């Protein structure tokens, strides 16, 4: 894919949140509305270095709120057996399809990724099966807000219900916390402990942090 074609696709699919290098062309730059130097490749490098084995061979990954799909693609490139990416936003969903197509052409290999354009709260988890890792990067605090409004009583209940249902389908979660009342490290610690998970590793990132939770069993 030529650089001019990449630039054209990036513009057509804007606005972007995940910052991804596409053969020297960045999906988002410092003058763009959602620019965050840590979104995308920077965050993936932390996940890969701090939480994951060198290979994801024979593992299944669930990437919730996958956005443009960079963590899904990167997991597949680490030899994951299968990756399921879930994204509610229609434009981000289209970005994910484009990013997958780009990296398949760039790496010259088929990536076993399935994207689902849906609300996380509506997923048929029993049908999706079990996963070795569930990524919930910067998404838990968004669950329920499209139905009930952000941080309403109903939205917070749905977040807890979703985590409870997910806990039956994995032994490892990787999430991001912030420093608000309903998205802090302590808040999520209590939420996950109620479902049999303990904080295994915490990586501070200023006002945010990355956490690995592992099942007690």
Where are the regions that the model predicts?
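Conserved class I S-adenosyl-L-methionine
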Residues: 59-67
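Conserved SAM-binding loop
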Residues: 96-97
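S-adenosyl-L-methionine
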Residues: 100-126
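A short SAM/SAH-binding and catalytic strip from SAM-dependent methyltransferases
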Residues: 133-153
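Glycine-rich SAM-binding Motif I of class I
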Residues: 69-73
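Conserved alpha-helix/loop element of class I SAM-dependent methyltransferases that forms part
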Residues: 38-56
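Conserved beta-strand signature within the Rossmann-like core of class I S-adenosyl-L-methionine
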Residues: 170-178
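Conserved SAM-binding motif I beta-strand of class I
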Residues: 82-87
């Amino acid at each position: 894919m030529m650089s001019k074609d990449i630039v054209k696709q990036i513009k057509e699919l804007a606005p972007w949140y995940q910052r991804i290098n596409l053969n020297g062309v960045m999906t988002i730059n410092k003058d763009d509305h959602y620019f965050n130097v840590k979104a995308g490749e920077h965050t993936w490098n932390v996940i890969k270095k701090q939480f994951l084995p060198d290979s994801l061979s024979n593992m299944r990954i669930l990437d919730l709120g996958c956005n443009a799909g960079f963590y899904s693609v990167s997991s597949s490139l680490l030899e994951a057996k299968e990756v399921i990416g879930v994204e509610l936003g229609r434009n981000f969903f289209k970005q994910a399809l484009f990013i997958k197509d780009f990296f398949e052409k760039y790496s010259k290999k088929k990536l076993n990724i399935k994207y689902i354009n849906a609300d996380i709260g509506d997923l048929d988890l029993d049908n999706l099966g079990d996963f070795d890792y569930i990524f919930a990067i910067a998404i838990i605090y968004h669950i329920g807000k499209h139905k009930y409004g952000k941080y309403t009583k109903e939205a917070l209940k749905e977040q807890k219900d979703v985590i409870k249902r997910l806990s039956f389908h994995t032994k490892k979660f990787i999430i991001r916390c912030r420093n608000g009342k309903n998205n802090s490290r302590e808040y999520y610690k209590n939420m996950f402990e109620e479902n049999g998970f303990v904080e295994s590793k915490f990586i501070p990132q200023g006002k945010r942090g990355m956490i690995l939770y592992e099942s007690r069993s």
